[in-house]
């Protein structure tokens, strides 16, 4: 397909309608495009061309014919649909426009235009479906500048790169059009650069090509070969360079644009008008040297780096796509008449009844209404054994039904499901910024101006005191300095590591909310953990009953268990289960009241019953001394004791034990080895807590801690200079998770706990914390290595390119070698970041 791009190079910079919230003006009035809405030609409003007012605006036309056509049906020519993203584009101000096979196409951004140019047939002829428009409310961000956020697609105003959608990506997005386009441009530039290299470097390699062809003819051939590379293949680079200048955000594209543009324009003038150059520009034989091969090879090598970067970024999304693939695409819905039909999962509503057959994935979160089965929940819990499910049991979308059929009720759908929240968390984390990036940004802000200054100084120094041809050598040194300096490596150092680390973490059940959590956890020195559910199984069992006075054990357990049926605490469930196993009857309870961190009370079978810990007894003014010996013995065995009070008098106690998880001891040792001090903060009494802590080697115990006491503990430790990570799983833990330097939500837990935490573990045990710690340390180590590569490379490369080694070794770096080194620096950073995919967690 023949594509004709309209000549708007002098206008090509970041899309002015992008609504980016980054503090930069999107366009200046002087740069506004005025386009004939009929034929698409650009029009100078001051040139006296025909114009027409409509809808409060003035439209300008290239000719009276176009004006007449517009006047007949103006509404038909006001806007056009972007064939790539489907957005409506104002035809009279469209910045991006081209013609293909006689048709006119308008685009909202350079990114959409590049996608169209990469595969016009896909968007023009409808040979395959175009990408679905992003969901309403989708925000877009720059992969290199995550602080840039836009409410529509387009180009980054800082660097000109295509903005990418934030949040959950589509699962059927297909190949990245930008990658397809860049690969095509790479092939063209590489194929044309090879003969340029042969012509330009032939004399150094003993190839008499220039002599055989003739110097003037060889130079014109170089001009013909280099022009498509610079003016077509490198066009995206120049657009980004122009965007950086217009928006006063100098970056790597500024340097590349200056370097390639300078080498090419100088060579064109040297070819077409060599007589204007003085002797200081002329080499052997009084010929003016040209650098077409340098310009073309630089472009090809930059494309190598860009293609590798795009492929690496594409691979980092594989973790998200793997999670998305866990969700089924359809579900079997049962209507009010009992008829069943397959519907897209997106069409499921809360309270819908769904049938799940053996081997199918549970479509959304909900609970069992009818039937029973076993469900593989390993994607959430990490446990390999299927879990039995019957009426009333909860279900998580994406888990696999093994051997039975059941009917479920949908309770959480769409973005509210556990799986969707996990995917959204991973996607946002990959776009987040680590605090260390702030230091990099401050360096980058002065880096590009400093490099331009060094290039200018290098040129002046060579021109003043360099050997002949000193002006040509000065130009060579200046171009080499511009090209070798690579802020790209600096820009990639942190984001690439964060993207890969968050994806790797998701695959290991460690969900990172943002990059700051990783950096803080790597520096943390103190970890606060709860006992129940974190160190222990979280499934306590009733072990002992001790009645006091004339109250029988069955009566004691009956009233205590009846009261606890109103509580959701794991210890309450243990007492209720124990009563059911013993066949003790339950009675009616009224006036139930829960005392946070203390216990419960209410009226059971006409008796005022209270059940709780020592704090509950203190509130009631009851002395537990009569049962102190029994209490201490049970606590010494690591059991949790709860006192039972009937009508204001001590009636007895019940004891519950929670088995320590098999993985806990090894995990605590691993956390100790990583330099963490471990503090157990629990609502249990001192004796029980210390018994558990001693068996596990925990450093410090804080017992009888109420939920609000955990936040006070964090404040106390922080005042001593500690960097604190806090692990919790419930609503009561949310304030402490938010107050800690790093909050760690254990298991899928409560929604508010996940929102308050920087890290969420899909499996609620210490092994997940070990993985998170290792991931955090590996990520920060990787970032420091990347920054070392980037800073070290520039510290060495820029002086060498400027020519500091020439007086010693007679070495003047070619811009081609500089471009190769620049690409190598980016490749080294990307390759090093990719090692995180294989880090031992």
Curated annotation (Swiss-Prot):
Record-stated family: Belongs to the cation transport ATPase (P-type) (TC 3.A.3) family. Type IB subfamily.
InterPro entries noted in UniProt: ATPase_P-typ_cyto_dom_N, ATPase_P-typ_P_site, ATPase_P-typ_TM_dom_sf, ATPase_P-typ_transduc_dom_A_sf, Ferritin-like_SF, HAD-like_sf, HAD_sf, HMBD
Bilayer topology: Multi-pass membrane protein
Organism annotation: Rhizobium leguminosarum bv. viciae
Any Pfam family: E1-E2_ATPase
Binding site for Mg(2+): 729, 733
Name by which UniProt lists this protein: Copper-transporting P-type ATPase
Keywords: ATP-binding, Cell membrane, Copper, Copper transport, Ion transport, Magnesium, Membrane, Metal-binding, Nucleotide-binding, Phosphoprotein, Translocase, Transmembrane, Transmembrane helix, Transport
Membrane-spanning parts: 186-206, 218-238, 256-276, 285-305, 445-465, 474-494, 602-622, 638-658, 742-762, 800-820
